[in-house]
């Protein structure tokens, strides 16, 4: 599971201790935006086996690659209108994020060459992290090959994660606002989310 929108080392370390597989750092306009320098400082304190994912929105490949190299990112998440041309130019594993409004979004996802596909709620002011779910039923009949690399996001929290995993059976789940209190990451909510997610993934 991925905890996204990390901005401080204490929360990052706690998430890793509780069993997070990946942490997300947002390098785009967001309530959780972080500078490359701050992200690098946090990443240096993290276990080697935890994935460090940088989130970008319509950024140039050159800037993405520069930040990835400087910070020590293991993956980049493309949360804007990026296409396969940009994906191919990256020399780091990629995640393409798509907003879901209908079954056709799932079909369109199969055309992307990213290593993983992240299904999220439709974008609003910010791309992602809006705390809203979408109809998981739209993803129920996903092809097996797509499901193997599918990440589920969008309004997940400790109360709905069990239903989400049972319905969609994703490769990974991604949470941000669902583990926050008054806009700040809440380590107790992170702990409860991870416990619930691991329970229903057994």
Swiss-Prot record:
SUPFAM superfamilies: Ribulose-phoshate binding barrel. One of its GO terms (molecular function) is phosphoribosylanthranilate isomerase activity. Pathway: Amino-acid biosynthesis; L-tryptophan biosynthesis; L-tryptophan from chorismate: step 3/5. InterPro entries: Aldolase_TIM, PRAI_dom, RibuloseP-bd_barrel, TrpF_fam. It catalyses: N-(5-phospho-beta-D-ribosyl)anthranilate = 1-(2-carboxyphenylamino)-1-deoxy-D-ribulose 5-phosphate. It comes from the Bacteria. GO terms for biological process: L-tryptophan biosynthetic process. Transmembrane segments: none annotated. Keywords: Amino-acid biosynthesis, Aromatic amino acid biosynthesis, Isomerase, Tryptophan biosynthesis. Its EC number is 5.3.1.24. Belongs to the TrpF family. This is N-(5'-phosphoribosyl)anthranilate isomerase. The lineage of its organism: Bacteria, Bacillati, Bacillota, Bacilli, Bacillales.
């Amino acid at each position: 599971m991925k905890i996204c929108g990390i901005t401080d080392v204490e929360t990052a370390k706690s998430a890793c201790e509780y069993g997070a597989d990946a942490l997300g750092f947002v390098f785009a306009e967001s309530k959780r935006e972080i500078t490359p320098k701050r992200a690098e400082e946090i990443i240096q304190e993290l276990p080697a086996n935890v994935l460090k994912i940088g989130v970008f929105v319509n950024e140039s490949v050159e800037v993405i690659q520069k930040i990835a190299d400087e910070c020590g990112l293991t993956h980049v998440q493309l949360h804007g209108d990026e296409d396969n041309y940009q994906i191919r130019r990256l020399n780091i594993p990629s995640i393409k994020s798509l907003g879901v409004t209908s079954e056709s979004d799932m079909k369109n996802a199969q055309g992307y060459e990213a290593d993983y596909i992240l299904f999220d709620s439709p974008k609003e002011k910010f791309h992602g992290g809006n705390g809203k779910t979408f109809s998981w039923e739209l993803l129920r009949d996903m092809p097996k090959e797509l499901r193997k690399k599918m990440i589920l996001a969008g309004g997940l929290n400790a109360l709905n994660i069990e239903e989400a995993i049972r319905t969609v059976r994703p490769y990974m789940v991604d949470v941000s606002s669902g583990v926050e209190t008054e806009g700040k990451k809440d380590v107790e909510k992170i702990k409860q989310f991870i416990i619930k997610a691991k329970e229903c993934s057994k």
